[in-house]
Each structure stands twice: as C-alpha cells, then as structure tokens.
C-alpha cells in the first residue's frame, strides 16, 4: 500500500503524465485526466494502460492525493 505522500507525488499517469489520486477503498491509483484507474496489487502499483480500468461516469473527484 502506498502510504507515503511523497511516493504518490512521484508517480504519474503513464498516458497523460498527470497526477494520480489514491483510492484506498478500491486499492487503485486514479487518473482523472485519462479517466483510468490503475490497480495496486500486493502493495505494487501496476502502471500499465492494459491493466487499467476505465472510470465510470458516476466516479467523481472524491479521492485525495
């Protein structure tokens, strides 16, 4: 699990280069710019577009960085 805020600041979306937000509940890193959610498995962020899921229309910017 990514608990260090500085670690999160270093990670960027591989598609847009934009910032990511952590969703602790779903264990995902969210790129609102790309509208993708990257999974975190066993504490490791999987930053591959092929592994990301598209965000649903009802998923809003409620997650904190």
UniProtKB/Swiss-Prot annotation:
Signal peptide: none
Domain of life of the organism encoding this protein: Bacteria
Gene3D superfamilies on file: 2.20.25.10
Gene Ontology cellular-component terms listed: cytosol
InterPro entries on file: Trm112-like (IPR005651)
SUPFAM superfamilies: Trm112p-like
Pfam families hit by this protein: Trm112p
Residues annotated as transmembrane: none
Similarity section: Belongs to the UPF0434 family.
Name recorded for this polypeptide: UPF0434 protein BQ10150
Organism of this sequence: Bartonella quintana (strain Toulouse) (Rochalimaea quintana)
Organism classification: Bacteria, Pseudomonadati, Pseudomonadota, Alphaproteobacteria, Hyphomicrobiales
């Amino acid at each position: 699990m990514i608990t260090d805020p500085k670690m999160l600041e270093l990670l960027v979306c591989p598609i847009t280069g934009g910032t990511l937000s952590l969703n602790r509940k779903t264990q995902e890193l969210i790129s609102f710019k790309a509208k993708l959610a990257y999974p975190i498995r066993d504490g490791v962020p999987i930053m591959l577009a092929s592994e990301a899921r598209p965000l649903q229309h009802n998923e809003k910017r409620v997650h904190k960085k």
